């Protein structure tokens, strides 16, 4: 009889221990950290015009439910900011600005590789082979003119880089600072690629004597010409188109007929982005037909990289412009060296 009771007691004890251990296991599972929720907010550094930036942010939020906090900066400023924040990124995406700067950022380990499925339809020459950045638009480099100045002085518009060196244009030219504005750097790189480094720097030194001001932002020279502050602004033609659309009837456009360069505006994810999944969604969305067509309805008139997207009619006037074989990879790889050489050339 005692043996039976001992067996029963042992069974109860074992059962209690089993329940106890099961309970402990259950408590451990309950304490496991919950899966990280996908962010519903993202910070984006934008290099497009303010109006376009606002609409891009608004439309992305409508389509995905993710709010965009954006900071508008020039390409050079954005690159400097991302460098400064390398160990503690404050933004997840870089949207807009010349690919030259993106290539430099990739070289410095500042970008995250991501091959969006929507990038498959975009031409290889418009994207990084490793997925670090993808092109979203093209802008042709040219001259934005104050027509009143040319009429008053009975002058012909410049149609070559050499025309800018004429005496009548001394102190009448504005361009972006190559160090802060990616547009300004494209001018430097384009001249060097067209003329060779030695002759190119000689030309830029001569051009420097004609320049009234180097602006912080690359689009500012167009506004200077529209306001009559300078006869010529060196920048992208779409900046001039925007001013004409805004009612600046004095603005005229021309470009170097021997061949001009173009920017390839890009989008990329910043290394160690604080909102990685939202960043991938933004890149996917930025490459769509809808996203790329937003600009032409909001003061941006660039050519587009998505073959399904319709380019703005206003830009088609320049679709047959002669382009140089602008090497973005070389330009990005040599950015620091060329800027140093340019600084030296203009100070001599």
Model region roles, listed by residue range:
Residues 1-42, 348:
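Short, low-complexity disordered leader/linker segments with a strong preference
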Residues 35-104:
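Early extracytoplasmic/lumenal segment of secretory-pathway proteins
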Residues 46-54, 89-229:
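Extracytoplasmic ligand-binding site segments that recognize negatively charged/polar headgroups
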Residues 100-104, 226, 231-250:
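A ligand-binding cleft/hinge motif common to bilobed small-molecule-binding domains
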Residues 111-118, 133-134, 162, 249-261, ...:
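Short beta-strand->loop
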Residues 139, 168-176, 203-208, 214-215, 249-271, 286-309:
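Periplasmic-binding protein-like
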Residues 144-149, 263-275, 286, 294:
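A bilobed periplasmic-binding-protein/Venus flytrap-type ligand-binding module shared by bacterial periplasmic
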């Amino acid at each position: 009889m005692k043996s039976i009771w001992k067996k029963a007691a042992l069974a109860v004890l074992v059962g209690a221990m089993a329940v106890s251990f099961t309970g402990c296991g259950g408590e451990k599972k309950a304490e496991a950290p919950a899966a990280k929720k996908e962010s519903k907010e993202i910070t984006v550094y934008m290099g497009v015009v303010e109006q376009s930036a606002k609409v891009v942010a608004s439309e992305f939020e409508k389509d995905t439910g993710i709010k965009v906090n954006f900071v508008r900066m020039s390409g050079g400023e954005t690159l400097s900011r991302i460098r400064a924040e390398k160990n503690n990124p404050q933004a997840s995406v870089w949207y807009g600005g010349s690919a030259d700067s993106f290539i430099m950022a990739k070289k410095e380990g500042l970008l995250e590789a991501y091959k969006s499925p929507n990038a498959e339809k975009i031409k290889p020459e418009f994207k990084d082979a490793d997925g670090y950045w993808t092109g979203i638009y093209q802008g042709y480099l040219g001259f934005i003119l104050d027509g009143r100045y040319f009429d008053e002085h009975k002058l012909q518009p410049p149609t070559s880089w050499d025309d800018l060196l004429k005496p009548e244009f001394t102190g009448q030219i504005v361009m972006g600072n190559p160090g802060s504005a990616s547009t300004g750097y494209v001018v430097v790189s384009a001249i060097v690629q067209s003329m060779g480094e030695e002759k190119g720097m000689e030309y830029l030194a001569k051009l420097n004597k004609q320049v009234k001001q180097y602006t912080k932002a690359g689009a500012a020279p167009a506004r200077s010409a529209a306001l009559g502050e300078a006869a010529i602004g060196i920048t992208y033609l779409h900046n001039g188109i925007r001013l004409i659309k805004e009612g600046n009837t004095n603005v005229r456009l021309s470009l170097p007929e021997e061949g001009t360069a173009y920017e390839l505006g890009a989008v990329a994810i910043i290394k160690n982005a604080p909102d990685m999944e939202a960043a991938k969604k933004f890149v996917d969305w930025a490459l769509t037909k809808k996203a790329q067509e937003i600009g032409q309805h909001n003061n941006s008139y660039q050519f587009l990289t998505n073959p399904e997207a319709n380019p703005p009619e206003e830009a088609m006037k320049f679709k047959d412009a002669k382009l140089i074989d602008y090497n973005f990879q070389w330009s990005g790889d040599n950015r620091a060296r060329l800027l140093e050489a340019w600084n030296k050339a203009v100070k001599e």
